[in-house]
Each structure stands twice: as C-alpha cells, then as structure tokens.
Amino acid sequence: FNLSLKNYIRDKINDVRESYPWEKFYITNYHQFIKSEANNYNLPIKGLTSYTDINFFEPVKNHIKKYKAIFIDEVQDYQTEWLEIITKYFIYEDSEFVVFGDEKQNIYRRPLDENKEPVIKTIAGNWNKSLNASKRFTSEIGKLAMKFQHHFLESKYTIDDMVVLDNPILDFEQRNIKYANIGTEASTERIFNIYKGTCKKYCLNPADITILSGTADILREVEYFIKTQLKENTTTTFETKEEYDKSKVETHSKNNFEERINTIRRYRRNHFSIKTGTAKLSSIHSFKGWESHTVFLIIEPHRSDSIQDFESVELI
C-alpha cells in the first residue's frame, strides 16, 4: 500500500552488517502482493473489490504457499479485510505475525477500537506499547512532537508515553526548528527562495534534504525551480511539471489524465530511495522523511481540486 516503504525497509536491512539470505526476504506492499499471488494461481483481479474480498483465494486455498513469518509496517493504513485475507490464506497456525502501527498517523480514517487504537481482529489481546523510547529524535523534536499530540490529537487518540533520549542512538543532529509563516497566497518562488536561503545559510548538502507536503501540487513547482534555477537533480515520488503539463495537453478526459498521472506516481514510488545523493521531494503519504538530516515541511491550505485531496492534522 505504501510503495516507497518497501525500498526504505530494504535499505535499513542492508545497513545491518550481516550476511542475510536475501532470497528468504519478500518485501512488497499489499496490493502488489495480492496481485502477484492472484497471478500465481490464475485468479483474475476484478477491480479494487478483489483486494477486500476475504474469500478471494478460496478456490486455491489448498495450493497457496504460506509464510513462517509476516511483518507489516504502517498497519494503521490497512483495511481490516486486508489483514483477514493475509491471516486466512498466507500464514500457518504457528507462524509469526507481527504488525507495527501508530493510530495517530491514521490519515485514511480507518476504524479504531474502544481504546482509540487500530482494529486488528486477527491478533488477540492488547497492543504491545513497549517500543516507547525514541531512537531517532533529539529532545527538541521529541518535545515538539509530544506538545503537538497533546494540543491537536488528545481528543481523538491515546497519546504516546514516549521516552525522548537526550542522546538517541540514531541521532541525526536535527537541532534547528525554524518556522516561516508565509500565508495562504505565497508563491512557489517565495517558498523556493526560503529553501535556497536556508541551504546557503547552513551549508546544506542536497543529499541530506527532504521536502514534504500533503500533496504533490506545490512540490511539483518547487522541484521545477530546483532543477531550472539551481541546476540540481532531484528524487521524487510524483511527476515532474513537464510531465504534468504534457499529460494535460495529451489526455482528453479527467479520468485519462488522472490515470496517466497515477501511473507515473506508482512508478516513482516503486523506485524511490533515500540513498540517491539528491534532494528528495515527496508527499507525506509516501515518505515521512524522519531519517533525513534536514526536512522542509510545507503545510498547504485546503485544496479541493487536487488529485489527492487530503487535509489532516495526522499528516503533520
């Protein structure tokens, strides 16, 4: 479901100084997994409903290859039916089935239980909340995150009991937290100039930079300025301005236009990597950017005409 996450997970495993048998790892996202398994057993995918049909694999249930261990990250993004399909057809009774999630990142409005936590019908008992010590955040960002949760999310979710270490193991030296209130009508050029000025002031390497926003609309324009004004390459999870404009001219309906744009985005997300040596631009849905040395977060006003129309405090 989160296409770029699979490359990130592979990179993190690769960072461990061990010789892993990569043929034993199958790292993918939900929809690609189901599509691949359906192809393996000659089952036709009949639209999005096939991905939520808990009996979809019933005709071939006795032939399906099962897994001794399945790990799911960002499980708050998953529909309940997806988890039922996985546990019904792809694990043994004694398989290891582990999910990781954070209901405060519930950007797709999945249902929560009476404890305001993700609903995982296939796993009994309470959530294990022992992973509460931040390994990445410095005290400055950790304290900011806690204040943000209490102010905006306390009425909707159970707030983290997070331990913020003064010297986290994965300390990425994120020390400066700066704000620029540029109003709702600020031009892309002004945002770009703030970016350029900050890079110059702090001598930032483009490889250490991630630019995030809720949608691709403004990121596309910022990326265009970086390429044309700074003459720098970039890595994105979305189409370029040139591709966007060309698609508008060449397609003759809104559906065809959106289909072409979504095809480009799927390809970019599938090949997105944090180890590119260039500045990275992404929607928060595809990459959260916390492993970057420097993150520029653009909080846009509500846009009803966006291809992906999201406005959510969970994104921030």
Each predicted region: which residue ranges?
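Core RecA-like ATPase module of SF1/SF2 helicases and allied nucleic-acid translocases
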Residues: K116-K143, F148-H150, K196-E314
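A short helix-to-beta-strand connector/capping loop
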Residues: E18-Y26, A124-W127, F172-N176, I274-T278
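Helix N-cap/beta->alpha junction signal
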Residues: F1-N2, Q79, T215
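Conserved Walker A/P-loop ATP-binding site and its immediately adjacent core
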Residues: F1-I13, T28-Q32
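Conserved RecA-like helicase ATPase core segment
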Residues: I85-E173
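Conserved helicase NTPase motor core
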Residues: E23-N115, G289
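Inter-lobe coupling/hinge region of RecA-like P-loop helicase motors
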Residues: N126-S130, S155-N193, L204-S213
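Phosphate/oxyanion-binding active-site loops and adjacent basic polyanion-contact surfaces
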Residues: L5, F137, I141-G142, G183-I191
